[in-house]
Amino acid sequence: MTLNEIAKKLIRQNKGRYLILSLSICFAILMTGAYGVLLFSPAITDVLMTDGSTYLIALGMYGITVLGIVVFLFYANSIFMKFQMGEIGIFLSLGMPPKAVTKMHNKQFDLVFTFSGVIGVVLSIPFAFAVWSFLTLFLSYTDHTFTIGWQGIFIAILIWISAWGILRLKNTISLSKADVIKILHSSSENE
């Protein structure tokens, strides 16, 4: 059995982990983008004065939400890496150098992060429209129709790329210091 066959078998066996990480990334980018699309929409910025206190409070809430989403992404990545250490330990025990294991892991991580981020950005506009439609059922505000706040999409893409780069670097550093004994010891510890 070659290393590629072992890697494919481990991915199939642990596809739930990849799915959870993918859904976490997609959810984080979707929420950031949808909130930004609504907040920076001309339908909102025309009603709320951009220098007014209500708009500044809304921007502050958006900033806190983005901070929470970044923390959520770090947490999801740490849980994913904790469970990936078993696979990484298998490859290290087979004699693969840590650099090769890191390269293989980064390839998988890049694929998951790219796929999930694109889906999150694409779905943020329909999700923002659904929220807008739901809100207009209860509010009598009908002067404007739904418009896209492109700054929100830009911020979501910026957070997506920044989080990808930081998490990839964090994972690379932790994998380059990986040791089979530490991995075996950490697998017996509880979270």
PLM regions and their residue ranges:
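Membrane transport/envelope proteins' first extracytoplasmic loop
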Residues: 1-70
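Transmembrane helix boundary and interhelical loop/hinge segments in multi-pass membrane proteins
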Residues: 74-90
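Conserved transmembrane alpha-helices of multi-pass membrane proteins
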Residues: 50-67, 139-166
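Feature of multi-pass inner-membrane transport and sensor proteins
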Residues: 1-19, 83-86, 97, 132-152, ...
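Short alpha-helical segment immediately N-terminal to, or the first helix within
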Residues: 90-91, 104, 143
